[in-house]
Amino acid sequence: MIHRAIVTKRIALRIGLAGAIAASIPIYAASLPSPAVDESRNEKKTETVVLAGGCFWGVQAVFDAAKGVSSAVSGYAGGSKANAQYEIVSTGTTGHAESVQITFDPSQVSLGQLLRIYFSVVHDPTQLNRQGPDEGTQYRSEIFYTTEEQRRVAEAYIKQLSDAKVFRGPIVTKVAPLQAFYRAEDYHQDYVRHCQQNLPVCANKRYVDYNDVPKLASFRQQFPELVKGGK
């Protein structure tokens, strides 16, 4: 059963359909270039990075559909274990960011490609401590790296995009080492898929339809070669 805390929070949409979609998907001055700097080829079979970019429902849905991603888990990063609970994190006072832990095969999809998706369709990196209708530090834009090479790639891509002025405003995305990741409650996992299937009855379908479904559609349209299963 969907937890009442998210029903209260998500159902109160403050903007209409057009405004919600516009606020949730980045607006560019030009299409995003591929990263000039990416990870070097390695023999690792799996790698993990944690990305924060607003409500984790849509972030998880997009990366779960990406080729080479074996796992996309909604959770919390940037705070302590003691208060890594949705009701507390939602106050915006714990230091956590709603995040998604992405485990991927670098031989199938590179970190640079994942970051291009992240900046293109997952969120608007020019919005400070908010995304669309959601406001608070828990919705901030942040990349939590697990290796120094990931840090190098992330910082280089942010600089590349900033220098190219592809966004109308400055990029506010933070880059920080991952200290810990705390898996979110089960009712948050695969939320968009469950909501689309109405399993269980989705009290937040309007929110998902306005804010998350367009991101997934945009990903499939812009990056068909990176869609899992080619569709």
Segments from the language model and where they lie:
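Flexible coil/turn and secondary-structure edge motifs
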Residues: 2-3, 14, 25-231
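N-terminal export leaders
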Residues: 7-8, 12-17
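Hydrophobic core
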Residues: 19-25
